[in-house]
Regions:
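Short, solvent-exposed beta-strand/turn "edge" segments of beta-rich domains on protein surfaces
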Residues: 29-33, 93
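C-terminal motif of bacterial Sec signal peptides marking the signal peptidase cleavage site
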Residues: 19-23
């Protein structure tokens, strides 16, 4: 009787662990764009941490600007994966496929974010823009590499 109870307990324990391991662990899937969004997944591959990342976007002639920073004022880690979304409702009747140009600005030291995206020149590094045809409902992957000494580069991953 004790042997059957022990086996039953072991089977139940294995089943519980299996369910927990498959259902309790979070999904490793990257966020996907909704049908009315263009999602940019920006992988930092830098030699040092940075203060902020500013994005100046031109979507079929409509210009917007924004930035990414940590709410706790800590630096963005050199290997962070950042998520940036362009929503269709922010633009006036865009087509499903648009010409998108993104110019990144790396702010090397933390500065308080501001609506004008105006930061000290000595901390600001302007990257060459990347341009491509983008479709709403699609996620694009961009990698930013480099360092303060040699400069930074942004590239659309294929």
């Amino acid at each position: 009787m004790k042997k059957k109870t022990g086996i039953l307990f072991l089977v139940l324990l294995i089943m519980a662990l299996t369910v927990c391991m498959s259902g309790c662990s979070g999904s490793d899937a990257l966020p996907q764009a909704a049908e009315d969004e263009i999602k940019l997944m920006i992988q930092l591959n830098l030699k040092e941490d940075i203060g902020l990342l500013i994005l100046d976007n031109n979507l079929d002639g409509a210009e917007t600007s924004g930035g990414i920073s940590n709410a706790d004022k800590s630096l963005l880690k050199h290997d962070d994966l950042l998520d940036w979304t362009l929503s269709k409702q922010e633009y006036e009747n865009p087509a499903d496929a648009v010409n998108l140009s993104v110019r990144f600005r790396v702010i090397t030291e933390y500065c308080d974010p501001n609506y004008e995206n105006d930061y000290p020149e000595e901390y600001t590094v302007l990257l060459d823009p990347i341009s491509f045809e983008a479709e709403f409902g699609t996620t694009y992957h961009i990698t930013i590499t480099g360092d303060r000494e040699n400069g930074y580069q942004a590239a659309l991953d294929k």
